[in-house]
Design a protein with these regions (language model features):
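Glycine-rich beta-strand-turn "strand-cap" elements at beta-sheet edges
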Residues: 1-4, 38-49, 74-106
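Short, well-ordered beta-strand segments in beta-rich or mixed alpha/beta enzyme
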Residues: 5-10, 39-69, 104-105
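Intrinsically disordered, low-complexity acidic/polar segments
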Residues: 17-19, 61, 97
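Short, surface-exposed ligand-recognition loops at beta-strand->loop->(often short) alpha-helix junctions
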Residues: 9-21
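An amphipathic, aromatic/His-enriched active-site/gating alpha helix that lines ligand/cofactor pockets
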Residues: 26-39, 55-90
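Non-catalytic surface loops within mature trypsin-like serine protease
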Residues: 12-14, 58, 92-95
């Protein structure tokens, strides 16, 4: 069961919204190579506000993700892409329902 998560809020610098969206799609490709990250949603919350929600089976998987290539890339590109440092919140999943694959936006 997926029991732990991460909610990462990102605020793009003015004019960098498309770059942040592209970065998130590249991150999705990297996450597909992480066996300890079974669920990831890249989200747009508003014109310049984005988020990522990841879910994990255990703390080891979550920590592996936090120590992995996506997090390192985010911290490397954050000064150029983001208006403020990313907000990273550890979450506990109380319940879930995922019945089909979600398609990515065009």
């Amino acid at each position: 069961m997926l029991s732990l998560g991460l909610f990462v809020r990102l605020e793009a610098r003015p004019g960098k919204e498309k770059d942040v969206a592209a970065f998130l799609m590249q991150g999705l490709q990297l996450a597909n190579q992480e066996p300890t990250t079974p669920l990831l949603f890249a989200l747009r919350l508003g014109p310049s506000t984005f988020a990522v929600f990841d879910a994990f089976h255990d703390e080891s998987g979550r920590q592996t993700h936090l120590d992995g290539s996506i997090a390192k890339a985010l911290m490397a590109y954050a000064p150029d892409l983001l208006a403020v440092p990313p907000s990273i919140e550890k979450t506990e999943i109380l319940g879930s329902k995922v019945s089909q694959e979600v398609r990515t936006a065009a």
